[in-house]
Amino acid sequence: IWGIGCNPCVGDEVAALLTRGEA
């Protein structure tokens, strides 16, 4: 998943998408 490990804020955005089932 892009963002994680590079930008914690972006990683949080991706985690939110996963939680919403949109990833």
Curated annotation (Swiss-Prot):
For the cross-link Cyclopeptide (Ile-Pro), the position is 1-8
Modified residue annotations for (3R,4R)-4,5-dihydroxyisoleucine = 1
UniProt modified residues of type (3R,4S)-4-hydroxyisoleucine: 1
The domain of life is Eukaryota
Q: Where is this cross-link: 2'-cysteinyl-6'-hydroxytryptophan sulfoxide (Trp-Cys)?
A: 2-6
Molecular function (Gene Ontology), one example: toxin activity
Residue positions, PTM 4-hydroxyproline: 8
Please report the PTM annotation for this entry: Processed by the macrocyclase-peptidase enzyme POPB to yield a toxic cyclic decapeptide. POPB first removes 10 residues from the N-terminus. Conformational trapping of the remaining peptide forces the enzyme to release this intermediate rather than proceed to macrocyclization. The enzyme rebinds the remaining peptide in a different conformation and catalyzes macrocyclization of the N-terminal 8 residues.
Q: Per the record's keyword annotation, is Cytoplasm included, yes or no?
A: no
Keywords tagged on the record: Hydroxylation, Thioether bond, Toxin
Annotated propeptide span(s): 9-23
Explain the purpose of this protein: Major toxin belonging to the bicyclic octapeptides amatoxins that acts by binding non-competitively to RNA polymerase II and greatly slowing the elongation of transcripts from target promoters.
Give additional notes from the record: The typical symptoms of amatoxin poisoning are gastro-intestinal distress beginning 6-12 hours after ingestion, a remission phase lasting 12-24 hours, and progressive loss of liver function culminating in death within 3-5 days. One of the few effective treatments is liver transplantation.
Q: Which family does it belong to?
A: Belongs to the MSDIN fungal toxin family.
What's the protein called, per UniProt? Alpha-amanitin proprotein
